[in-house]
UniProtKB/Swiss-Prot annotation:
Modified residues (N-acetylmethionine): M1
GO biological process, one term: cytoplasmic translational elongation
Organism: Oryctolagus cuniculus
Protein name: Large ribosomal subunit protein P2
Keyword Mitochondrion annotated: no
GO molecular function list: structural constituent of ribosome
Gene from which this protein is expressed: RPLP2
Modified residues (Phosphoserine): S17, S19
Quaternary context: Heterodimer with RPLP1 at the lateral ribosomal stalk of the large ribosomal subunit.
Protein family (similarity comment): Belongs to the eukaryotic ribosomal protein P1/P2 family.
Function: Plays an important role in the elongation step of protein synthesis.
Entry keyword set: Acetylation, Phosphoprotein, Ribonucleoprotein, Ribosomal protein
Length: 44
């Protein structure tokens, strides 16, 4: 859920196609580590 929420935050912020790096940056800002496998499933 955290990955979907981060993706949606990036999209609402004006990024029409958020990358994994964008989502990781959002998660890092609140102290959450990103799992690359799960993150890539959300992006693809």
């Amino acid at each position: 859920m955290r990955y979907v929420a981060s993706y949606l935050l990036a999209a609402l912020g004006g990024n029409s196609s958020p990358s994994a790096k964008d989502i990781k940056k959002i998660l890092d800002s609140v102290g959450i580590e990103a799992d690359d496998d799960r993150l890539n499933k959300v992006i693809s």
